[in-house]
Amino acid sequence: MAVIYKTTAHASAGREGVVQTVDGFTVSLAFPKPGATHQDKNNPEQLFASAYAGCFSQAVRVVLQQHQLQLATQPIVGVSVELHDQDGLFHIKAGVELAITGVDQTTAQTVITAAHAMCPFSRLIKPENFLGLTLNGAKL
């Protein structure tokens, strides 16, 4: 397996600190507040959801290209990330939703399933921490 990209991030002060990558990305962190819809700082769950959504969206694009499908509207990927506390041990669970138009249900299901198999983030999540796939609002 050949490395095609590598970066390193450094963090200090935990969830109340700062994360910086060696290539210039910097973000201030804050612990997520239950019920808060907007904070001036981000949390690791938001960053994970954003990265996973971007990665899965790229996997969808690749699958569409492989099947020679051109859509009038770009599919939208949503990733939900939940932070769970089980006896003081935190767990992250994640699920993926795809909104796609311009193809039939069978093709859409093929796209989301193939993208899930291809996406590095999907392969990273253990089955017990995966909340599942949702296609156009329907859980698969």
UniProtKB/Swiss-Prot annotation:
Transmembrane segments: none annotated. Gene3D superfamilies: 2.20.25.10, 3.30.300.20. Coiled coil: none annotated. GO terms for biological process: response to oxidative stress. Belongs to the OsmC/Ohr family. This is Organic hydroperoxide resistance protein-like. It comes from Mycoplasma pneumoniae (strain ATCC 29342 / M129 / Subtype 1) (Mycoplasmoides pneumoniae).
